Swiss-Prot record:
It is found in: Cytoplasm. This is S-adenosylmethionine synthase. K(+) binds at E47. Binds 2 divalent ions per subunit. GO terms for biological process: one-carbon metabolic process; S-adenosylmethionine biosynthetic process. It comes from Symbiobacterium thermophilum (strain DSM 24528 / JCM 14929 / IAM 14863 / T). The keyword Transcription regulation does not apply. The lineage of its organism: Bacteria, Bacillati, Bacillota, Clostridia, Eubacteriales. The keyword rRNA-binding does not apply.
Length: 398
């Protein structure tokens, strides 16, 4: 597999924190954080549904901690910005229902101690088994300083800016829901220019589309985007339907785990299918994907490749990965097989070791439930560290 040649377009999207699916992710991760703050070894799989006037929180949670979930939900909804009935949703008056069960004992017996050491007392904390089967992907490339693909990086920055100008009063007529999309023109695998930007921003009913278009270009797009990437052929579609008043959970039902491509690489890399939010780190859907990003980013930061995708796969109840694959699309300084060997020598990808090395039993998850889990220079995220660069270069002999 090599880099694509010639000229082509690639598009990624993001959504604001007020999008109903992202509201669900933030609520699920807020519940997770609140529990981990009191019980770091809790087992949490928290799912959220939002619709007009109602939030439903369900899932499997095993913990000795008590968390007031209804009040927590209301705090999250109000913090996002749904504070008035005229927005179609109000955190102070919406209904909140909870339906929580404990984790299945059949799953727990495989996670508590992996099959490799079941019946033994040997490095027990490191030898917890994977919480499920599955494959996860991590990716990094040199298109941005944070080693992320440019389309998703810009889409996230635009979405965050859209929320910022709403919250700080720069554009007071904006409401919480919104989406962004960026199309980049590439040539021989390198980004050259922005072809198209799409922004849909929920707004008050008495604001004209002309005003919204002008303000979004001036205060959102031009504040975020490198003007060297814009030319006279760049197209802007601002609220292209002509009106976006009804939004949030009133406009669409929100569900945890419905924005997995927004959460990762914007479709630029492959995805194993597992969502992140609401899951404690024994769930390899989350910790495995974070570790794969950590590995891929260190390979690129070490100068061993310009693009790197890492696949890791697990069996439920088994600690060691069943497979590790490194793909560098023809940009690697070493063969992909050799890089995979370096990964096995340098990184311990057992779930317990990932949890230890990345210190994942902490309440750090709600902050990444909107605007991306990866490539966040605004946050100090352990899976974004490039702490294995020197060791990788030494082992690679460069």
């Amino acid at each position: 597999m090599t880099e694509q040649k010639g000229r082509y377009l690639f598009t990624s999207e993001s959504v604001t924190e007020g999008h109903p699916d992202k509201m669900a992710d933030q609520i699920s991760d807020a519940v997770l954080d609140a529990i981990l703050a009191l019980d770091p070894r809790a087992r949490v799989a928290c799912e959220t549904l939002l619709t007009t006037g109602l939030v439903v929180v369900t899932g499997e949670i095993t913990t000795h901690a008590y968390v007031d979930i209804p009040n927590l939900v209301r705090d999250v909804v109000r913090d996002i910005g749904y504070t008035r009935a005229k927005y179609g949703f109000d955190g102070s008056t919406c209904g909140v229902m909870t339906a929580i069960d404990p984790q299945s004992p059949d799953i727990a017996q495989g996670v508590d101690v992996a099959i490799e050491v079941r019946g033994e007392v040997n490095e027990k904390e490191l030898e917890i088994g994977a919480g499920d089967q599955g494959m996860m992907f991590g990716f990094a490339c040199d298109e941005t300083p944070e080693l992320m693909p440019l389309p998703i990086s810009l889409a996230h920055r635009l979405a965050r800016r859209l929320a910022q100008v709403r919250k700080n009063g720069t554009l007071p007529y904006l409401r919480p829901d919104g989406k962004t999309q960026v199309t980049i023109e590439y040539e021989d695998g390198r980004p050259k220019r922005i072809d198209t930007i799409v922004i849909s921003a929920q707004h008050d009913p008495d604001t004209t589309q002309e005003q919204i278009r002008k303000d979004v270009i001036d205060y959102v797009i031009l504040d975020v985007v490198d003007r060297n990437l814009i030319d006279d052929r760049t197209r802007y579609f601002i609220n292209p339907t002509g009106r976006f008043v009804v939004g949030g959970p009133q406009g669409d039902t929100g569900l945890t785990g419905r924005k997995i491509i927004v959460d990762t690489y914007g479709g630029y890399a492959r995805h194993g299918g597992g969502a992140f939010s609401g899951k404690d780190p024994t769930k390899v859907d989350r910790s495995g994907a974070y570790a794969a990003r950590w590995v891929a980013k260190n390979i690129v930061a070490a100068g061993l490749a310009r693009k790197c995708e890492v696949q890791v796969a697990y069996a439920i109840g088994v600690a060691h990965p069943v497979s590790i694959l490194v793909t560098t699309f023809g940009t690697g300084k070493l063969p992909d097989e050799r890089l995979a060997q370096l990964v096995r020598e340098t990184f311990d990808l057992r779930p317990g070791a990932i949890i230890r090395d990345l210190d994942l039993r902490r309440p750090i998850y709600r902050q990444v439930a909107a605007y991306g889990h990866f490539g966040r220079p605004d946050l100090d995220l352990p899976w974004e560290r490039t702490d294995k660069v020197d060791l990788l270069r030494e082992k690679a002999g460069i």
